[in-house]
């Protein structure tokens, strides 16, 4: 990941996210002009009210080979074309020979996965636009969204 600060978010907030990613081994920091020639994802840390402006700017640049997608209130990610959670879910299904899939997600980057799932849910605290397109709206993440979804799936499977 490349973590880029945009707008008025505090340096401390950016540093905390960076440190979390570095502890997880999925982030490296580079000085300007350094960095890999190939990358997997760029994470822009943006105040939520500025996400539309930053997205419009990125799209105006007509980037070749990647697209912007929001993954959190503060995160706008640039990911390679053709890469999505939906594609990843299908690859896992095929590798394991699964005929059905269930998925839960709360942001725009989860949409391709939710669209392909046989059963899907969004937490109450998730994106309101996604909530309109799913089978279930479950409790918030903080209150056990995944457990709520599993209980609902169990009810469907035992009917």
Residue positions per predicted region:
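Conserved acidic, metal-coordinating active-site core of Asp-based
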Residues: 1-104, 108, 113
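Mg2+-dependent phosphoryl-transfer enzymes with acidic/Ser/Thr/Gly-rich catalytic loops
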Residues: 77-159
């Amino acid at each position: 990941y490349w973590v880029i600060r945009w707008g008025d978010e505090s340096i401390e907030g950016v540093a905390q996210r960076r440190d979390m990613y570095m502890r997880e081994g999925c982030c490296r920091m580079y000085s300007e002009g350094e960095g890999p020639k190939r990358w997997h994802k760029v994470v822009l840390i943006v105040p939520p009210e500025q996400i539309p402006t930053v997205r419009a700017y990125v799209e105006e640049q007509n980037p070749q080979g990647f697209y912007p997608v929001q993954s959190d209130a503060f995160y706008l990610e640039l990911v390679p074309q053709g890469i999505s959670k939906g594609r990843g879910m299908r690859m896992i299904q095929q590798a394991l020979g699964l005929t059905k899939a269930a998925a839960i997600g709360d942001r725009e980057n989860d949409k391709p996965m939710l669209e392909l799932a046989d059963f899907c849910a969004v937490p109450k605290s998730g994106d309101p636009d996604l909530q309109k397109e799913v089978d279930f709206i479950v409790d918030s993440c903080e209150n056990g969204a995944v457990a709520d979804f599993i209980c609902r799936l169990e009810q469907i499977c035992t009917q």
